[in-house]
């Protein structure tokens, strides 16, 4: 059953790949958004040289390219073939040599243990049938002292609905919603507790208020429907 659910999830994102970057929040369009993302990455990235990094659930490569621009070697993985194809197209177009993209299941990575200094994901956990197994898998491929970073949100917060076109708002997900344990998101505090339960140390989090404010302002400027999702980043380290 899990494989069938994953195929439905992959098919959904596969169809969205050609226009994924046009959807709200999937790109940086304003100086305030740029400043927010710079602060976020300054906050969560380990302060040591070039890192071997994995972007789990990379989509079309937003975080992959952000990390590469900071001098890191990055592999992006995604279960949706069209997302990987679009990420590779962008990589070739931009001439970015320090990135690679592979079609892979974030719950069952094709890498040996202790392969990376950093594993990062954005808005992925809530789409997975086995999110806790994914966290274990991400920890498995991290080196001692390596860091896990999750950027996510609580998409049912208050009266807010999920982003248009997302898995949460799509009728095709009605049949599998009960098999996605984190559908709708989890709170920052819940993810911090989850990190600790899985053995990570020096766990911390940030509510991303600057990013939320920047995106809210952009909604006003573009005449979009107002949404007030809670967003956050949580990070923790593998013990040495």
State where each predicted segment sits:
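Short catalytic micro-motifs in class I SAM-dependent methyltransferases
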Residues: 123-124
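C-terminal alpha-helical "lid/dimerization" subdomain adjacent to the S-adenosyl-L-methionine
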Residues: 7-8, 24, 151-217
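Nucleotide donor/acceptor-binding cores
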Residues: 50-52, 114
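A short glycine-rich, Lys/Arg-flanked "PGG" loop and its adjoining helix->strand segment in the class I
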Residues: 132-144
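Core SAM-dependent methyltransferase catalytic element
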Residues: 217-240
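A conserved beta-strand element that flanks and buttresses the S-adenosyl-L-methionine
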Residues: 120
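Conserved class I S-adenosyl-L-methionine
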Residues: 1-49, 62-66, 174, 209-211, ...
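Class I SAM-dependent methyltransferase SAM/SAH-binding core
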Residues: 52-56, 60-108
């Amino acid at each position: 059953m899990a494989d069938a659910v994953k195929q439905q999830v992959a098919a959904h994102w596969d169809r969205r790949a050609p226009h994924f970057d046009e959807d709200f929040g999937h790109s940086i369009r304003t100086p305030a958004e740029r400043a927010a993302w710079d602060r976020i990455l300054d906050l969560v990235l380990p302060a040591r040289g070039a890192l071997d990094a994995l972007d789990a659930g990379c989509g079309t490569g937003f975080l992959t390219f952000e990390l590469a621009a900071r001098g890191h070697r990055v592999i992006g993985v995604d279960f949706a073939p069209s997302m990987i194809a679009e990420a590779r197209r962008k990589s070739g177009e931009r001439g970015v040599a320090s990135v690679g993209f592979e079609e892979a299941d974030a719950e069952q990575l094709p890498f040996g243990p202790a392969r990376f200094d950093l594993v990062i994901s954005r808005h992925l956990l809530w789409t997975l049938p086995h999110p806790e197994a994914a966290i274990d898998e991400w920890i498995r491929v991290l080196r001692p002292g390596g860091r896990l970073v999750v950027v996510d949100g609580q998409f049912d917060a208050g009266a807010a609905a999920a982003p248009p076109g997302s898995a949460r708002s799509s009728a095709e997900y009605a049949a599998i919603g009960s098999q996605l344990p984190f559908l709708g998101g989890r709170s920052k505090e819940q993810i911090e507790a989850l990190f600790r339960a899985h053995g990570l140390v020096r766990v911390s989090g940030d509510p991303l208020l600057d990013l939320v404010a920047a995106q809210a302002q952009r909604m006003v400027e573009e005449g979009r429907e107002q949404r007030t999702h809670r967003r956050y980043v949580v990070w923790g380290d593998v013990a040495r």
